[in-house]
Curated annotation (Swiss-Prot):
The gene is ssb. CDD domains: SSB_OBF. Pfam families: SSB. This is Single-stranded DNA-binding protein. It comes from the Bacteria. GO terms for biological process: DNA replication. Residues 112-145 are annotated as: Disordered. It comes from Clostridium tetani (strain Massachusetts / E88). Residues 1-103 form the SSB domain. Keywords: DNA-binding. GO terms for cellular component: nucleoid. Residues 130-145 have a biased composition (Acidic residues).
Length: 145
């Protein structure tokens, strides 16, 4: 089984490219993922390279920017290539098949616009709703178990 699920922040704006010939969108970025605190109490992070293909690649590049919180799931993949100096280079990266934007906002916006920011839209959260009014009583004699 090769499955990875990560939540972290973009270290810089995603880079969108298109493959020659087919024109398939591919976006690359580095995700900073917090680790548990070290023995001396300092917070540490791992920096994970991520690749996204297709429509998700375009959406990620268009709507995400440096510092935004993002969740991804996918697989770890290793590959190698020959560098310009003739040496063989090896790369380990996550190929994401699912991307979740945990903070919204285009590249021009500033500040956090996360899902949990109820103050920005007071209609999105109302703790005065009484959902118990919608419950219909059930005669326990009618329940088959």
């Amino acid at each position: 089984m090769n499955r990875v699920v990560l939540i972290g922040r973009l270290t810089k704006d995603p880079e969108l490219k298109f493959t020659p010939g087919t024109g398939t969108a591919v976006t690359t970025f580095v995700l900073a993922v917090d680790r548990r605190f070290s023995k001396d109490g300092k917070n540490e992070a791992d920096f994970i390279p991520v690749v996204v293909w297709g429509k998700q690649a375009e959406s990620t590049a268009n709507y995400m920017s440096k510092g935004k919180l993002i969740g991804i799931s996918g697989r770890i993949q290793t590959r190698s290539y020959e560098a310009k100096d003739g040496t063989r280079r090896y790369v380990t990266e996550v190929v994401a098949d699912e991307v979740k934007f945990l903070e919204w906002g285009n590249k021009q916006s500033s500040g956090s616009q996360g899902f949990n920011n109820f103050e920005s839209d007071p209609l999105s959260y109302n703790n005065e709703d009484n959902y118990n009014d919608d419950i219909t009583p059930v005669d326990e004699g009618e329940v088959p178990f």
